């Protein structure tokens, strides 16, 4: 019993040091503890090893053991993907990387510049889109994001694109206007996937962002950026645990090819 407790304490400290959110650590440890304390030590395993085995199983249960693909409509039907997230998470670059990835898989993607607030957001998307050889639909910054999204959707249908990726505005922090705008876009066209782009370096903050977006707008998956930095991976675990949504890709660097599938 004492050995089990010591091992559990070590696991708990390791998770907290990895920047996993406190709430998630608490829930996770409860699940592990319930199994560890009630279980006879399996032959050939010492209590410490047994705890590690349980932790491993619980982690797999939480994160899933499969990679998750973006669900795309068949054939020439247009799949609409709305990118959401805070400013500085790397949303615009990630939108272009995702378009490039889908293009390399034989899709015909169209990027739409729906961020009319941040100076140079449209230009940034155009530059990144060009690098990927993907067309960027823009109506300048005088139209509403909803109108731009609708225009892009019509354009995608007419020109036989089968994926439309909407680059929406980020804010420095979550506000009602931002959420409302995303909801308005969702109401105006058939958004298939809302993908949240989160900066993994923000650790605990990333979790709050994911939770709020999930509650307000609803998200279908997450892309974690800046995973090549000094991040300890805790954000991935916390976001999955709290939002219940899969992590689709991780951004591992600046290059457009650095968007990698997430392998739990």
Segments from the language model and where they lie:
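Primarily NTPase-proximal linker/entry elements flanking Walker-type ATP/GTP-binding cores
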Residues: 1-114, 121-141, 148-168
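Alpha-helix N-cap/helix-start motif
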Residues: 91, 95, 121-122, 175-178, ...
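Conserved phosphate-handling catalytic cores of large alpha/beta enzymes
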Residues: 150, 161, 173, 180-187, ...
């Amino acid at each position: 019993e004492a050995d089990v407790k010591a091992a559990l304490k070590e696991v708990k400290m390791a998770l907290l040091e990895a920047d996993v959110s406190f709430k998630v650590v608490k829930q996770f440890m409860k699940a592990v503890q319930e199994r560890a304390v009630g279980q006879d030590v399996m032959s050939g395993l010492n209590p410490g090893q047994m705890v590690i085995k349980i932790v491993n199983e619980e982690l797999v249960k939480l994160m899933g053991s499969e990679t998750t693909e973006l669900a795309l409509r068949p054939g020439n039907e247009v799949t609409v993907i709305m990118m959401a997230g805070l400013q500085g998470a790397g949303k615009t670059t990630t939108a272009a990387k995702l378009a490039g990835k889908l293009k390399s898989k034989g899709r015909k993607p169209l990027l739409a510049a729906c961020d009319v607030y941040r100076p140079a957001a449209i230009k940034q998307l155009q530059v990144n889109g060009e690098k990927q050889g993907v067309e960027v639909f823009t109506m300048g910054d005088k139209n509403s994001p909803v109108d731009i999204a609708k225009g892009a959707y019509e354009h995608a249908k007419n020109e036989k694109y089968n994926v439309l990726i909407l680059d929406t505005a980020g804010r420095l922090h979550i506000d009602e206007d931002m959420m409302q705008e995303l909801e308005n876009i969702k109401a105006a066209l058939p958004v298939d996937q809302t993908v949240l782009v989160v900066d993994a370096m923000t650790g605990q903050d990333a979790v709050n962002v994911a939770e709020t977006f999930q509650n307000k707008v609803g998200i279908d998956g997450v892309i974690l950026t800046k995973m090549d930095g000094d991040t300890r991976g805790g954000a991935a675990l916390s976001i999955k645990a709290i939002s219940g949504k899969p992590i689709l890709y991780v951004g591992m660097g600046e290059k457009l090819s650095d968007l990698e599938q997430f392998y739990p």
